[in-house]
Amino acid sequence: MHFHFSKMHGLGNDFMVVDCITQNVFFSQDLIRRLADRHTGVGFDQLLVVEAPYDPETDFHYRIFNADGSEVEQCGNGARCFARFVRLKGLTNKYSISVSTKKGKMILDVEDDGEVTVNMGVPEFEPNKIPFKAKQKEKTYIMRAGDKTLFCGAVSMGNPHVVTVVDDVDTADVDTLGPLLESHERFPERVNAGFMQVVSRDHIRLRVYERGAGETQACGSGACGAVAVGILQGLLDESVKVSLPGGELHISWQGPGKPLFMTGPATHVFDGQLSC
């Protein structure tokens, strides 16, 4: 099997992006794991696959696979790179691009300055739709992780997120708590774990331990989930700067029932081809 690919990143969250419209490529879980290896493969956090639309009302179908080969529902940083990729490769000349995903639809708007704004849809807080095991919907849940008691928010941005507020992200025990939360029994499909430091009402710092990928330089859907939880808990205003290890995103949300918007960069690194 021979195919072309692009390497891209959104704030250091890096991707291998493959056009599966003009190329016939099949990715097994084992192949994805081998390609994701940073020593013996291409190296990436996620594989992004561009497919022809499943829905006639959309332009493309967007699939995401983590480095462990598991397919996931959403990746916000990947969505921005997806939009740049389909324009760079001449698959569309639109500036507003509609895509379907495993969990729904998104609109990707390419800005004049090269940044991309993504309509991430309406944040979902109903426990059974996240999914999250809870008797009823709450703004804050008490959870045990190892020997720690955590006060967390839970939300789906098309994929599940748990968010806990910390005093300082630099000293947060992400290496220990991240894996414990990722595989916590209350999240039957596992979860992305966000550790949020509130700097001010319009600025947070964030680290994210991603389901199936570990801690990454940036997580777009994680930034969205953290801001949504922060606004719901009364900690943040409607427009928030999110500082991640890899850079900054801007998130805006007018509250429950409204769509949430994320704006940030998408960088093309190089093109390559593989035979495997």
Curated annotation (Swiss-Prot):
It comes from the Bacteria. InterPro entries: DAP_epimerase_AS, DAP_epimerase_DapF. Substrate binds at N13, Q46, N66, G76, N77, N159, N192, E210, R211, G220, S221. GO terms for cellular component: cytosol. The keyword Cell inner membrane does not apply. Its EC number is 5.1.1.7. Belongs to the diaminopimelate epimerase family. Homodimer. This is Diaminopimelate epimerase.
